[in-house]
Each structure stands twice: as C-alpha cells, then as structure tokens.
C-alpha cells in the first residue's frame, strides 16, 4: 500500500518557513517611500550645509583627476539620503523610535533591550560602495558640526571593522585622508 503524498514541510510545519529570517529590515518599505518624496520635494528640513552637500554630491558633474566622469551609485545615494532623513529631518535617535515610526506591522514589533545610544546602519551588498557611504556620512556630520555649530553632529569618528581583511581595506581608503582627497566629497 503506497504512502500518502506528505512532504517534509507537511511533516514539520515551520521548519522551512524562512519568513522570520527575511524580515531583517522592517522599516525599509516606509522609509524608501518617504525618502523618495522628501528628495522630490527638495530636501526640506535640512541645514544649509546638508543641502549644499546633497546638491554637490548628486546634482553636480564631477571629474576625477584622471578626467573620468564620476557619479555616486543609486544605492549609495539612497543610503546617505535615508541616513540624513532619519537623523536630521525626523530626528530619530533610538531604534525604538525608528521601529515605532516606520514599521508597517505593529504586531511584529520587538523593541530592543538596550537602546541608550543612537545607532544607524545601511544594509548594502558586497561591492555596492559602503566605504563611499561612510565617507559621505563623515563629511555630512563633520561639516554640520563645524559650519552649523550643532552639537547633534560629530567632529570625531570611530570606524569599526568586522575582520582584518575589511580593516586593511578601510585603512588603505581612509589613511592620510585618501578617500577625502580622491572622491568628490566636499
């Protein structure tokens, strides 16, 4: 007598349900929409320094010393714009505020246990230009701290690396201000 046509998934429900692991960025859909609207409306709510930087980075033609045309990739632009929008426009300073404000399903809301310091991240693929986004964020913070005399912005920065390979790459990019001299940042 043949067995029933049960599959492994039927025998162990939930074992192959990967949806909990795919929900690592629950705020992204709402933020992506809001940031696009904010961009289309001319970056309202930012300092004059931030507006100058955004216009320079994304609305100015850049030529490298090699005479090659340079533009930031769309993922890099979206990452720094989102960071600026969340920090400067919406003034979100905790993961709790971020989750409560932008998560679409409040039933899945799990507030972090330790949330005393503002922490921001961008989730970007390998080779998509995370180091360039880091340099954009540093320039944005530094010049707002200096030009706007605003204590909400930093003048000193700590860059952490997950391993020696990444550390060596970051060191070669940032050592001696190389990335700030080679890229059109300011």
Range-by-range predicted roles:
Residues 1-186:
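RecA-like P-loop NTPase motor core of helicase/translocase proteins
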